[in-house]
Amino acid sequence: MKILISNDDGVNAEGIAALTTALNQIAETLTVGPDRNCSGASNSLTLTNPLRLNTLDNGFISVSGTPTDCVHLAIRELYQDEPDMVVSGINAGANMGDDTLYSGTVAAAMEGRFLGFPAIAISLVGHELKHYDTAAHYALKIVKALQDSPIAQDKILNINVPDLPLAEVKGIKITRLGARHRAEGMVRTQDPAGREIFWLGPPGDEQDASDGTDFYAVANGYVSITPLTVDLTAFEQLSALESWLTQIHD
């Protein structure tokens, strides 16, 4: 089995090393990640600059691009034979609810699925992020299960693991995405030259963290698995929009 591993925290991040070590037990892995932290990169591609590669001492390959660039480049150019699966992570922090729209971790998995391969994204949720070994354990279990029973062709699995010792995790829940309140405002400050600058503020608190959501599962000590689709069409709105279309006049 061949597995392509990527992330958005950068090729030197602790999470991608833990994930690679775990998956090396069952697969031939190729680890290709951005040369810097690309958190929040979503599905962005590098279109105006060339991509430069560097092979590190541990065999990982760094790319001067986004997580999506990494997966696209690896599959198109670095593999003689295609991988069997794409695994993205282990992200340093949650990718739940609205986070998935901005996440480079989820985007790397999404690019794998766009290109026709089973794909999962895995994140470690907590404040101190001590237990990458727990997330790696569940990544290994889930990859083994996918090897035996693949999921639908147009889906990826978004996995969030509570930052707990393995023995304290209560199990796995299949969940839907929750939702956050609107993000807090920008942080206004000055650079050393006295010029005004802005930082993005923290994300909003949970708005929908009810039973059945990813937020609820992780908060209660469970691993959350949420199936995501790459087709963003709101199918339930199609017929309503057909009726609405009659209101548009020349």
Swiss-Prot record:
Residue runs in coiled coils: none
Keyword Methyltransferase: no
Gene3D superfamilies: Survival protein SurE-like phosphatase/nucleotidase
Cell location: Cytoplasm
Cofactor(s) needed for function: a divalent metal cation
Main location: cytoplasm
Any one Gene Ontology molecular-function term assigned to this protein's record: exopolyphosphatase activity
Residues that coordinate or bind a divalent metal cation: 8-9, 39, 91
Enzyme class, broadest EC rank: hydrolase
InterPro entries recorded: SurE, SurE-like_Pase/nucleotidase, SurE-like_sf
Listed transmembrane segments: none
Keyword rRNA-binding: no
Reactions performed catalytically: a ribonucleoside 5'-phosphate + H2O = a ribonucleoside + phosphate
Cofactor binding description: Binds 1 divalent metal cation per subunit.
E.C. number(s) listed in UniProt: 3.1.3.5
This protein's GO CC annotations: cytoplasm
Keywords carried by this UniProt record: Cytoplasm, Hydrolase, Metal-binding, Nucleotide-binding
Family: Belongs to the SurE nucleotidase family.
HAMAP family in UniProt: SurE
Physiological role: Nucleotidase that shows phosphatase activity on nucleoside 5'-monophosphates.
Protein name in UniProt: 5'-nucleotidase SurE
Organism encoding this protein: Shewanella halifaxensis (strain HAW-EB4)
